[in-house]
Amino acid sequence: PAYIHMYDVLKGLQKGGSFLLNSIWDEEETKKHLPNHMKRYLAENEINFYIINGTKTGQELGLGNRTNTIMQSAFFKITNVIPYEVAVSEMKHAIDKSYGKKGEAIVNMNYAAVDAGGKEGNLIKVTVPAEWKNLPDDEIKHDENRPEFIRNIVDVMNAQKGDDLPVSAFNGYEDGTFPAGTAKFEKRGIAVNVPEWQVENCIQCNQCAYVCPHAAIRPFLMSDEELAAAPAGTQAKPAIGKELAGYKFRIQVSPLDCTGCGNCADVCPAKTKALVMRPLESQMVEENRWEYMDKKVGYKKIVEPNNVKNSQFTQPLFEFSGACAGCGETPYIKLISQLFGERMMVANATGCSSIYGGSAPSTPYCTNYESGRGPAWANSLF
């Protein structure tokens, strides 16, 4: 549901059309989260509004975060562009063709996803009150601390409204270069669940930060004074290692930058896991702590980055990219940026790395807070 605040998802939907939303909430809670302009459009255009918790259903069926089959089935149930029974039959035939060699269990799991998408009780038609027609637009809060480039160009383009930008908006950017480190301003909040640090279980190996595809979980070293000045409730423990004597150790998550892949929790080698996946909304208190750790505590060069643990105390110069949740490529780029980023030049070959590395206007390559240096990146299609 984060996307309903990012994009105009109803744009182009004609009067009497149908809108299907994958929502983690029930009908009443979903209504509370919809922005007013969206409610007004639904009412004015007599839209048939449906919700389904494809996320929960996919997890219950063993499909993890995959919802596409569930949503496709729900689409056919709602639209009736072809008889639903025919759609189900064709989808299951495609499943046999695609997954038959992977075994009966995988096939049946996907069969169940098809059936779940059109099942009564899963697919819910939402009542659209007539009074929604009179709702005013929500008050838009402008953060004047956001750089001008972000407010005037990045935010507009990320909302899929780049065609609305006048040529004059690009004054100063005539050569096609964009500033580095713009991805950190997106704060997409797309995860359903994010990791919660269990301080008492942590063995301080930093493997969670090492495998994170988006640099959304990091270790920090604090002095007693820094810990005392941290937001209320901030937990830490004495850092392990003679070089780190006197410092306090903390693992910090950026909930709005996390994609919820769970790689960190999976890799945690502690006897009792030091990371437990929790609903995003329950972890929003961590956002202020993230800002404090990243901006105020910073990245201390106390130890040489000569092993996995030590490398993760270094600031990543590749962060919050648009890579898929759980990506296996980006942790390598992130690590290279931690080791050599201040003197890196990247001539990128086209592929996934060009998409998550520089989909205009977002740039995950950033600069070191101390030196202002970071990777220079360019990509040529040919």
Regions flagged by a language model, labelled:
Residues A87-M91, G100-D257, A265-F382:
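Ferredoxin-type iron-sulfur electron-transfer modules and their immediate structural context
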